[in-house]
From Swiss-Prot:
A GO cellular-component term linked to this record: cytoplasmic vesicle
Organism annotation: Homo sapiens (Human)
Gene: ATP2C2
UniProt keyword annotations, A-Z: ATP-binding, Calcium, Calcium transport, Cell membrane, Golgi apparatus, Ion transport, Magnesium, Membrane, Metal-binding, Nucleotide-binding, Phosphoprotein, Translocase, Transmembrane, Transmembrane helix, Transport
An individual GO BP term: mammary gland epithelium development
Protein name in UniProt: Calcium-transporting ATPase type 2C member 2
Lineage, top ranks: Eukaryota, Metazoa, Chordata, Craniata, Vertebrata
Amino acid sequence: MVEGRVSEFLKKLGFSGGGRQYQALEKDEEEALIDEQSELKAIEKEKKVTALPPKEACKCQKEDLARAFCVDLHTGLSEFSVTQRRLAHGWNEFVADNSEPVWKKYLDQFKNPLILLLLGSALVSVLTKEYEDAVSIATAVLVVVTVAFIQEYRSEKSLEELTKLVPPECNCLREGKLQHLLARELVPGDVVSLSIGDRIPADIRLTEVTDLLVDESSFTGEAEPCSKTDSPLTGGGDLTTLSNIVFMGTLVQYGRGQGVVIGTGESSQFGEVFKMMQAEETPKTPLQKSMDRLGKQLTLFSFGIIGLIMLIGWSQGKQLLSMFTIGVSLAVAAIPEGLPIVVMVTLVLGVLRMAKKRVIVKKLPIVETLGCCSVLCSDKTGTLTANEMTVTQLVTSDGLRAEVSGVGYDGQGTVCLLPSKEVIKEFSNVSVGKLVEAGCVANNAVIRKNAVMGQPTEGALMALAMKMDLSDIKNSYIRKKEIPFSSEQKWMAVKCSLKTEDQEDIYFMKGALEEVIRYCTMYNNGGIPLPLTPQQRSFCLQEEKRMGSLGLRVLALASGPELGRLTFLGLVGIIDPPRVGVKEAVQVLSESGVSVKMITGDALETALAIGRNIGLCNGKLQAMSGEEVDSVEKGELADRVGKVSVFFRTSPKHKLKIIKALQESGAIVAMTGDGVNDAVALKSADIGIAMGQTGTDVSKEAANMILVDDDFSAIMNAVEEGKGIFYNIKNFVRFQLSTSISALSLITLSTVFNLPSPLNAMQILWINIIMDGPPAQSLGVEPVDKDAFRQPPRSVRDTILSRALILKILMSAAIIISGTLFIFWKEMPEDRASTPRTTTMTFTCFVFFDLFNALTCRSQTKLIFEIGFLRNHMFLYSVLGSILGQLAVIYIPPLQRVFQTENLGALDLLFLTGLASSVFILSELLKLCEKYCCSPKRVQMHPEDV
C-alpha cells in the first residue's frame, strides 16, 4: 500500500518510468501519505515497548522509566498506545491449560472396579459362547458409564462457572483522565493510582508515594507489611527487598501511591509463579466427606450381602457365572456410588441459582454452612446503609447552625443558615465557608458522573462543597503530605500550602470529635481564632451527642499551622440512610432464628438510632462499646455478646474478638462488611460476606461470599438456599437408600429360600440407572421449600441420616420388598421356574415402586398436593422418561431379548400401578399424621427429625 503511494508520488513529480507520464501529487494525498507513515512509525515504536524486569525497573529514574515505556506520567497512555500494546502483550490475565480431553475423561470411568468386573463377566460370556449375555452386559456397562460421565462432566462445567467471580478492578490514568477499569485491561506503561484496600493489579514501579505500606505476605510469606518508596535503588538485590516495586496480587494496607505498570499477565512475577503451579484438586466439603464415609460403609455392607448371596447360590447348585454376573450387577446397583456426585451437583446448582440472584459463593462448603448460620454480624456503613453519604447538618465552632438539602453525589441542593433560611454560597459566611473548605481539602474523593471515586464520607463532603460552589478550592492548594485515616487513630490530615501566596504551611484535619479536639488549642469565631475553653469543648460535645442521636455520623474539622496548634472549625452531620429492604430482611432473618448484630465504629447515639431504624430489636437495644469488649474477661465475653445487638466504637481487633466470642458460645457466625477494617473479621467468621460494588479488594479476598449488587436482603435468599439444599440432599439419600436396601433384600431373600432370581443382571443395571440417574438427580434440584427457611438453624452436628429418616427409609424399603415379592410369588409357576412373564411383572413392579417412592421423597414434611406436581419440571421429565424407557424395555422386541421381558396387558400395568402406589399413599399418610398428630413444639425443637 505504501509502495503504491510512493510510486504515485514519483509519477506526479514527473519522473518517467516505463514510458508513462507522471502527474504532481495532490495536497490531501500528500498529507494522507505522511499520516500513514507516521502511524506506521508509531506502531513500530509501540512494538518496541516490552515488559521490564523488576530488578531493572527499580534502578530507573522516573524520567528514564517514562522514556522506556513511552508514557507521560501526568496524562498516561493514549487509547492508540493501549490498543497496540494489547496486541503485543495480550490481556493482563492468566489462562490455565488444564483441560483434559473429553475422551480421556470418558475412558477414566472404566477404571471403576465394579465396571471392570462387569466387563470381565461379559468376556467370560463370550468365551462360553453366551453372546446375547455378553452384548447385554456390554450395553449396560456403556449406559452406566455414560450416565456417570455426563454427571461428572456437568459438575465440572458448573464448577468452572463458579470461578468467574467478581473481576478485580483498578484506577488508571489514561489520556489525562483517571478511569476505573478492570485489571485485565492494563498494559505495560499504564499509570495506575493505588489507595488503601486496593489489590495491586500488575507489577508496578512506583513514581509517587504517600506513607505506602503493602501486605506482600501472599508473595513473600512475611506477615509484616512492607514500607514503599518512589526513589530509585542502587542495587538490585532480592525481589523481596525492592522497595519501589509493588507486585501483582499484593494488597495496599496503608497510604497511597502511583506508578507505571512494568509487567502484566504471565510477564509479572505472579505470572512466573503461575507458570510453575500445578493444578490442585478442589478439597471436598464436610458434607461430601460424610457422604463418602456413608458410601463406604454401605459399600462394605453391600459386598458382604452380595458375597453371601453368591456363596448360598453356588452351594445350592446354581450356575456360578450366572450368580457372579448377578452379584456384580447387584453391587453396581446397590452401592450408592452416585451419592458424592449428587451432593456435588446439588451444591453447585444451588450456588448457580444463588449467582442468578446476584450472590457469588466462592467456596462450595459455604453453601451447606449457610443452613447452620445462627448469628449475622454486620458492619453498618455501606452494608446496612445505602453508602450514599449525605451531609444534612452543619454546626460551626462559634455556634451557627445550617441545614443542607439534596441527597447523593450530584451536587444538587442548598446550604441554609438557621433560623433565617439564608442560602450560603462560597464564603458569604466565613465560619461555614472555612468549615466546608477544610472538608474539601482534607479529602481524596473525586465525584464523576454523580458517582464517588473514593470513600463515601469524603464524597459527602465534596458534594457539600459543590452545593456551596467551593469544590474547586482544593485546586488552590499544593498537597505536601498526607496522614491517612485508620481505624486506630480515627482521623486523617493533609499538609498543604497555597499556590498563589507565599505563606506558611497549613494542616487540615477531619475525624472523630474526641480525637480531633485533642489537637486543637483555638476555635474559629467568625474568622478570628480564639482560645478553646472548657465551655466551648462542652458545647461541641453536646452538639455531637445531639446530632448522633438523630442517626447522623458526626465529623469534626480543624485547621492550623501545626498538628498540636489547630483551630477547631466545627461539626458536620452526615446521614447514611438504611438500604432499601434492610429492615424487612432483618425481620425475616430474626423470624428464621438468625440473630442480627450491628458492629460499627460510630458513636453510641448514632449506632442506636440506626439500630432502631432497621428494627434490630423490638424491645430495648443492648449495646456494648469496643472498650468494654477489651475489658471483659474472655469467658464472660462469650456469655454477654449473645445478648448484645449493637457494638459501637469498634476497631478491627474488636470485631475479631466479638466473632471469636460468638463462635466460642457455639454460634455459627456470618459477617458482612465492605472495608479494609472488616477483612480480619470476614476471614475469621464461618461465613464472610463482602459487598461487590462498594467493597474493597481486601474485603472481597477475605470473604467466602460476595453480594454483587450490595443487596443485604440477598442474604435471606442465601440462607434459604443453604437450608433447602440440605433438605434436598436428605430427600435424595432417602430415595437412593430405600432402593438399594430393597434390591439387596429382594435378591437375598430369593437366594436364601432357594427361589429363582426375581431380577436378572440387565434388569438390576436398569434399576441402577433410575436410582443414580435423572429421577434421583432431579430430587437434588427440588425448588427450595419456603417452610425450610422458617426452621431454626440446624446444628453442624446434625447428620444426614437422622433417626426419623432411617425409619422412613426402612418403611419405604419394607413396602417395596413386600409388594415386589407378592408379585414374584403370584406370577411364579408351580414348578418354581423363572419365566419371562414372572421376571417382567416383578421387574416392572419394582420400577413402578421406585418411581412412586421418588414422588413421595420430594419432601419429608409436605404432601405432594402442597408442593405441587408441576413445580419441579426436571422431576416430571425424568419420571416420564423412565416410564417411557420401561415401556420400551417391555414392548420393543430387540430390548425384550436384552432384558428377557415379554409384553404385558393393560390390566397388568394398571394392577402394578395400583400396587406400587401403596408406597406413595402410606408415606403421604405418615406425613399427614406427623403434621396433625405430632406436637408443633417438638417439630420445631428437632427440625432434623422432620
